[in-house]
From Swiss-Prot:
Identification of the protein by name: Acylphosphatase-1
InterPro entries in alphabetical order: Acylphosphatase, Acylphosphatase-like_dom, Acylphosphatase-like_dom_sf, Acylphosphatase_CS
Protein keywords: Acetylation, Hydrolase
Enzyme Commission (EC) number: 3.6.1.7
Organism name: Mus musculus (Mouse)
Enzyme class: hydrolase
Length: 99
């Protein structure tokens, strides 16, 4: 298996103006476009959090997207990524918005 094909899982939390600006919808759409699986949800702290799973090259692209792009009306202050690990199989079959 090539390096870019290694499956990884990583948790994320995005800080800034990320609620009420369709951030979850755009995150889900971008994740699906890249073929990633996982989830995204708003938190009570005014952040957005979730988990990404997929090939490391696609996860890296999505991490950069979460740090720098987001939804058109969002303003991202920072993105935290943690608990990254190599996985043998995906835990999810889709990219879901969790309410």
């Amino acid at each position: 298996m090539a390096e870019g094909d290694t499956l990884v899982s990583v948790d994320y939390e995005i800080f800034g103006k990320v609620q009420g600006v369709f951030f979850r919808k755009y995150t889900q759409a971008e994740g699906k476009k890249l073929g990633l699986v996982g989830w995204v949800q708003n938190t009570d702290r005014g952040t957005v959090q979730g988990q990404l799973q997929g090939p490391v090259s696609k996860v890296r692209f999505m991490q950069q997207w979460l740090e720098t792009r987001g939804s058109p009306k969002s303003h991202i202050d920072r993105a935290n990524f943690n608990n990254e690990k190599v996985i043998a199989n995906l835990d999810y079959s889709d990219f879901q918005i969790v309410k």
